[in-house]
Structures are given as structure tokens and as C-alpha cells.
């Protein structure tokens, strides 16, 4: 993972989670800052001593090539409808269902911002990329975001407090088990 320029994205989001949700300001801030520093160092290293970071997977978001990835963040802030149109394609919707349906959509069942930051890698790395293998469950690109989704599912399942959610717990478990078995049997 030391040569993967996307690994710090996962770590930075975990740092934000620690900072915002767990109130571990020192550790969360340190993990976030170190991850950002490592990311910029890895991209610089790849640009100067390798073939460069694979930002071409995000070409549809880069409006000004001279700014590189910074231009991508401008596109996200200025034109969120365009970003949604790029994310909500049929193959990415199928991928979204393949990732979230076995988890009963539990990773999405929270109103706490600190938990939602763990969804950033899933959206950024998997759904926003135009590289078809990054939004396919049959390739390694889902390892990091899948682990974060699984963690969120467990934490949100534990935190379900409303009576209706308590009654639906067995339904969540059953649907997750059914989807997991169906997925394994089709592979």
C-alpha cells in the first residue's frame, strides 16, 4: 500500500471520522494531515520518477489540466448535477446495489456527518471514476471502500435506536445473508 496513491484517501477519511465522530482530535487530525502529506508526496513522486498518478480516470471532472486534481474539486463544488450525472449511470447503479444491498443499505442509515465521511472513498474512488474496473466488484478496487462500508453497516446496525428499526433488524440480517449467498452462488 505504500505505493498506492489512493490509500491515503482511505486513511484521510478515517482520520476525519476519528476527528468528527470519535472526538479524538489529536489522532484524527494527525492521521488526516499525515495522509494528505503522504498523498501529495506520492503523487509528486509518481509524477517525477514514474508514469504519474492515474488521474486520467477522473478526466471527465478535470476542467483545467494545469490544476490537475485541484480542478476536479472545483468541478465537484461548482457543478454537483454534472457529478451526479456521471455517478448515476446504469453500470454504476448496479455496482452501488451490489455493494449496498448485501449490507441492507445500513452504511447510509445515519444522520451523523462523522459517519458519512467514511463514504467519501466509495464515492470518490469507485463511483466517480470512469475506469470500468473501479466500479466492479470483481476487481481489487473495492477493498478499501468495501471495508469502510462493512464497518459503517456494523456501527449503524448497533446504533439503530428507533423502535421500527429494532423490528427491522432481522429483516436487515436476512436480506444481507440472502444477497451475500446469491452473490457467491453467481460468481
Question: Predicted regions: what is each one?
Answer:
Residues 86, 92-123:
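Hydrophobic, aromatic-rich transmembrane alpha-helices
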Residues 1-6, 20, 40-45, 107-111, ...:
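Transmembrane helix irregularities
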Residues 10-36:
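Perimembrane helix-loop-helix junctions
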Residues 18-27, 153-174:
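Membrane-interface junctions at the ends of membrane-embedded or membrane-associated helices
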Residues 3-12, 96, 100, 140-141, ...:
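Membrane-embedded alpha-helical segments of multi-pass membrane proteins
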Residues 116-164:
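Hydrophobic/aromatic-rich transmembrane helices and adjacent perimembrane loops
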Residues 35-36, 42-82, 122-136, 142:
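Extracytoplasmic catalytic-loop and juxtamembrane helix elements of membrane-embedded
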Residues 32-36, 160-187:
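Signature aromatic-anchored transmembrane alpha helix within multi-pass, membrane-resident enzymes
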